[in-house]
């Protein structure tokens, strides 16, 4: 099993219940592929550096997951096909960082 940190950007048009439903879908996908979500953080609505699909803001969600690298392509394919998700990024790490993340700390200031 490999460790990954993931950031998923959701459309700013979505309400909290819809975002929660999309998060549940992501959780189920990871679990179905024998993976595990260790931690997650809500970074909230943030400005984008550049417009994505004519949006200048997005809801950021951060995850620490553990899954086989070979299964990651299935997750990426599913996320790419979801119109409610603007972007996603997975980074392989040796160890997960301690929470709260620096991004979360900046939000609280």
Map each language-model feature to its residues.
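Structured, basic alpha/beta domains of bacterial-type, RNA-associated proteins
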Residues: 2-109
């Amino acid at each position: 099993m490999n460790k990954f940190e993931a950031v998923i950007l959701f459309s700013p048009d979505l309400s909290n219940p819809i975002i929660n439903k999309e998060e549940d879908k992501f959780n189920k996908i990871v679990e179905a592929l024998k993976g595990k979500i260790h931690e997650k953080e809500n970074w909230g609505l943030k400005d984008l550096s550049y417009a994505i699909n004519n949006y200048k803001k997005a809801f950021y969600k951060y995850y620490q997951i553990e899954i086989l690298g070979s299964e990651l392509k299935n997750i990426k394919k599913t996320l790419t096909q979801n119109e409610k998700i603007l972007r996603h990024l997975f980074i392989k790490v040796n160890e997960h960082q301690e929470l709260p993340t620096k991004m979360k700390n900046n939000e609280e200031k």
